[in-house]
């Protein structure tokens, strides 16, 4: 008997919960432990500048722009911000492919300085 995955309840998930799903998916696909550790470290750093307890479907372009501004104001190096944004872009692209159909999520990787 096969078990179907239910997408109900997806709209109530926070950014952090969806990110955890992303990490599980990437681990299952065989990404190295070092890459997974980097993702976890980066989301921890990102959470200082972006509310990851916010519902995923409520994430806006403005939230990400405010995150970048906050990172710049806190004195983070350009390379650090770029690294965090690359991980976030990878996560947002995965989110789009996995049913998070906000038009913002698709547009974000081209419109933002990520």
Predicted regions, residues:
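A detector for short, charged/polar N-terminal pre-domain segments
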Residues: 7-16
């Amino acid at each position: 008997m096969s078990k179907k995955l239910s997408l109900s309840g997806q709209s109530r998930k926070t950014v952090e919960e969806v990110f955890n799903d992303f990490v599980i998916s990437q681990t299952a696909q065989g990404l190295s432990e070092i890459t997974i550790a980097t993702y976890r470290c980066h989301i921890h750093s990102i959470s200082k500048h972006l509310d990851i307890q916010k519902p995923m479907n409520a994430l806006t372009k403005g939230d990400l722009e405010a995150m970048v501004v906050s990172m710049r104001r806190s004195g983070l190096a350009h390379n650090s911000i770029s690294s965090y944004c690359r991980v976030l872009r990878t996560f947002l692209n995965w989110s789009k492919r996995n049913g998070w159909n906000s038009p913002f999520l698709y547009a974000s990787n081209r419109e933002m300085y990520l």
